[in-house]
């Protein structure tokens, strides 16, 4: 499939970009209140040019603050605040408490002024690629920061920015199942536009007797940063990462060109978008990915407690779990284990094409280890006739589906670590959890033995990983911001380095990481970075697209008040 744009529109856009390049000489993007900021009449004319699709940001938490306070609305907001559906239906709301910075929080005092802070100033509720083109052009002509957003599932603040104009893709809801034919793949596929979420595609695929490699969180959008950043799934040990399934992209680049990117058309852009991160190479309108026939699935939930902290039996059991984990992932399983200093919760272990009997046999050696340690546990093994049924039973109800305010860090841990130095991993888990950190280990196998010969820009450390780890510490609603920032700094300087010492070369999944990661280029992109930067320069020569820790972001810096300025070059 190849999309075409009329030559007159394309020519006008390219000429416009060339003409405005001189207008981008300012070292900083324009902000509200600047003399270069568009007037209300300018915004009105732009709104007319895009069919009235401009959204003026009204902060979601506004009803909880004077002079807009409404008790009933505020109470309802507080009840719904941790539900992602509340935020992903907004063009501007920020799920991450660290990024939102209490600028308009439903849980801060009513008397505290409600400001936009890091929220975008305006958004374009896009309905077509032409809306992308028009918005890119306007942002370039007016030297305005531009960001891309679907749902706002974003720990690092990539999809928002103070004084920014957002391309909001949330209304683009098309799903087309097709038989795809190319030199590289022939078989079932699905084309999804940029606003699709798991809540849309999962039931649609199920009705067709198919599955896709999508996220564990149902409200995440598979077309944006999820797949563009790699994207792990409960089906990853069976099929690979989400980025491994991409057949082609439809994308508007920084020159306003609507392009198809596949292994044969603009292959460098295809390679970059498939794992090199979102928000920086262009605005994706649609993606076409592989689909697979559905199958029966068995799910496991296993829990035990640290009832005797004076002994080391609990962490011995954790060590045994990690020792057995490669057996589960080699069988096509994907495991999510949450470990604190008081409890271990596996919820769930997903085993495609396994029966309950086969699953219990697979778990047998680990359960025997627990018996020998005299550790009591609860175990539930659930068979489902389809992956969708399994998802709705064991994954969708999981508390991790809620907005999780926390300090985040992460690391990919290689299989070699478990096989050779599992005791060091156990010591690290014990040290981290003793400090109040939750260790979430997502066990999977996306090596070449699973994916085959894949060509994309996924961080190489994924291919040798036994698990991707997320570290979190609690961020209660209404918590003291200063105290939370202290914990965030500890994540950067103390807790993440514990895992880095275990696997200094592996890197980290960019979408579940410390936003303050010091060596982010190496950690998130590895040896791919220089090639990704060259592709960024080719398709976005004016550096229209910026996102925190995205490729090319080192050329910019966020200054006081959120102003985005060109970074000072070091000699």
Swiss-Prot record:
Disruption phenotype: Strongly reduces the production of patulin and leads to the production of a distinct dark-red pigment. InterPro entries: BBE, FAD-bd_PCMH, FAD-bd_PCMH-like_sf, FAD-bd_PCMH_sub2, FAD-linked_Oxidoreductases_BP, Oxid_FAD_bind_N. GO terms for biological process: patulin biosynthetic process. Glycans are attached at residues 47, 101, 125, 179, 341, 374, 380, 421, 445, 480. Gene3D superfamilies: 3.30.465.10. PROSITE patterns: FAD_PCMH. Pfam families: BBE (PF08031), FAD_binding_4 (PF01565). Its cofactor is FAD. Pathway: Mycotoxin biosynthesis; patulin biosynthesis. Residues 115-294 form the FAD-binding PCMH-type domain. GO terms for molecular function: FAD binding; oxidoreductase activity; polyketide synthase activity. Induction: Expression is correlated with the production of patulin. Expression is positively regulated by the secondary metabolism regulator laeA. Expression is strongly decreased with increased sucrose concentrations. This decrease is lost in the presence of malic acid. Expression is increased with pH changes from 2.5 to 3.5 in the presence of a limiting concentration of sucrose, 50 mM. Natural phenols present in apple fruits such as chlorogenic acid or the flavonoid epicatechin modulate patulin biosynthesis. Changing residue 381 to I: In strain: MD-8. FAD-linked oxidoreductase; part of the gene cluster that mediates the biosynthesis of patulin, an acetate-derived tetraketide mycotoxin produced by several fungal species that shows antimicrobial properties against several bacteria. PatO acts with patJ in the vacuole to convert gentisyl alcohol to isoepoxydon. The pathway begins with the synthesis of 6-methylsalicylic acid by the polyketide synthase (PKS) patK via condensation of acetate and malonate units. This is FAD-linked oxidoreductase patO.
């Amino acid at each position: 499939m190849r999309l075409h744009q009329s030559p007159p529109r394309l020519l006008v856009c390219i000429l416009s970009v060339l003409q405005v390049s001189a207008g981008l000489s300012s070292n900083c993007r324009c902000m509200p209140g600047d003399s270069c900021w568009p007037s209300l009449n300018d915004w009105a004319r732009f709104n007319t040019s895009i069919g009235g699709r401009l959204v003026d940001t009204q902060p979601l938490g506004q009803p909880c603050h004077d002079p807009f306070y409404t008790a009933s609305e505020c109470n309802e907001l507080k009840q719904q605040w941790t539900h992602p559906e509340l935020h992903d239906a907004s063009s501007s709301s920020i799920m991450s408490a660290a990024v939102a910075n209490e600028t308009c929080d439903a849980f801060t005092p009513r008397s505290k002024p409600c400001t936009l802070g890091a929220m975008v100033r305006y958004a374009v509720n896009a309905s077509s690629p032409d809306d992308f083109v028009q918005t890119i052009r306007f942002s370039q002509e007016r030297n305005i920061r531009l960001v891309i957003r679907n749902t706002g599932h974003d720990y690092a603040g990539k999809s928002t920015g103070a004084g920014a104009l957002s391309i909001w893709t949330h209304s683009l809801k098309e799903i087309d199942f097709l038989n795809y034919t190319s030199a590289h793949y022939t078989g079932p596929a699905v084309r999804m536009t940029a606003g699709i979420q798991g809540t849309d595609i999962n039931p649609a695929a199920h009705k067709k007797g198919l599955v896709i490699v999508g996220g564990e969180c149902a409200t995440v959008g598979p077309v944006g940063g999820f797949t563009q950043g790699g994207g792990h799934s409960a089906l990853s040990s069976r099929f690979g990462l989400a980025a491994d399934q991409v057949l082609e992209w439809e994308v508007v680049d920084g020159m306003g060109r609507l392009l198809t990117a596949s292994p044969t058309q603009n292959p460098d852009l295809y390679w970059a978008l498939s794992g090199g991160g979102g928000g920086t190479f262009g605005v994706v309108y649609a993606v076409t990915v592989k689909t697979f026939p559905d199958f029966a699935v068995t799910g496991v939930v296993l829990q035990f407690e640290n009832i005797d902290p004076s002994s080391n039996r609990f962490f011995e059991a954790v060590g045994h779990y990690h020792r057995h984990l490669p057996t589960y992932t080699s069988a096509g399983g994907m495991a999510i284990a949450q470990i604190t200093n008081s409890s271990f919760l596996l919820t769930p272990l997903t085993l495609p094409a396994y029966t309950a009997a086969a699953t219990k046999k697979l778990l047998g050696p680990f359960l025997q280890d627990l018996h020998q340690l005299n550790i009591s546990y609860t175990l539930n093994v659930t068979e489902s006739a389809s992956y969708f049924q399994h998802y709705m039973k064991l994954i969708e109800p999981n508390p991790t589906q809620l907005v999780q305010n926390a300090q985040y860090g992460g690391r990919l841990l290689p299989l070699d670590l478990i096989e050779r130095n599992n005791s060091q991993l156990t010591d690290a888990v014990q040290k981290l959890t003793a400090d109040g950190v939750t260790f979430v280990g997502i066990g999977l196998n996306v090596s070449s033995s699973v994916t085959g010969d894949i060509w994309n820009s996924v961080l190489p450390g994924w291919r040798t990983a036994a698990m991707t780890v997320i570290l979190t510490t609690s961020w209660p609603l209404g918590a003291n911001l200063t105290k939370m920032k202290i914990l965030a700094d500890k994540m950067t300087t103390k807790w993440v380095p514990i895992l880095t010492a275990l696997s200094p070369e592996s890197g980290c999944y960019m979408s579940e990481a410390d936003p303050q990661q010091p060596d982010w280029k190496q950690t998130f992109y590895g040896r791919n970075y220089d090639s990704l930067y060259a592709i960024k320069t080719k398709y976005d020569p004016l550096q229209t697209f910026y996102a925190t820790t995205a490729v090319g972001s080192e050329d910019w810096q966020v200054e006081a008040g959120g102003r985005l300025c060109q970074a000072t070059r070091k000699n």
